Amino acid sequence: EQRHVLRDEIFPLNVAYNVYLSASEFRKAYNFEKTSADFTYEASREAEAPGREIYVYIIGEASRAMSWELYGYERETNPRLSQVDDLVIFRDVLTQSNTTHKSVPLILSSVSTEEHDQLYRRKGLPALFNEAGFETWFISNQSPQGAMIDKLARDADHLIYIRSPRHDMQLLDEMRRIVETAPAQKMLFILHCYGSHFSYHQRYPREFARFKPDDDVAISREHAHTLRNAYDNSICYTDHF
């Protein structure tokens, strides 16, 4: 316990430790192709569907349950989802991390936080579906960073980064184009959204400015109401998406 306190809480020891930790994680991510090369899920299909199969896996970003109407929020931020019959809502779910670069790789893999080191030895969701005979697409509205998200995404048959990322509806436009033109019968699409990341005002078109004022303002207490409006508008846009 004393070693933990020295390492994590006392300056400058914590700086040196975090530099070491970052370098170690970078090295593991850099070597991912080698350390996961022999991994297999041994996945296969036991039965064939009669028609075309299209599965869509959507990864949202920076979206809080407390700002969703479906979870009891007082504002109507989920007008479309609220009208869906037989919608399955998970109410007892926690993210394994509150940062994108830590949580999304876990979402894309079979690894949990308790076995985080296995992340660098196992392939992710695209590889699993590839083994089962699917053609896979990873379409992202975020720029590549060379981190574990991109490493896992490269296992997809097709990796597409939207140029000049703006609004997430571009992901659906790209997916529709592929569905209409690709001959594949078994398809998996993983769509990585920009979601509700700051600056909130830029995350949705003007016609989705349901709550106003929603000006593009700096983060400060005096702008809290405006920022909340813009954030809630971004949730509404995700609902439309």
Which residue ranges define each predicted feature?
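Short glycine/proline-rich turn/loop motifs
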Residues: 106, 218-229
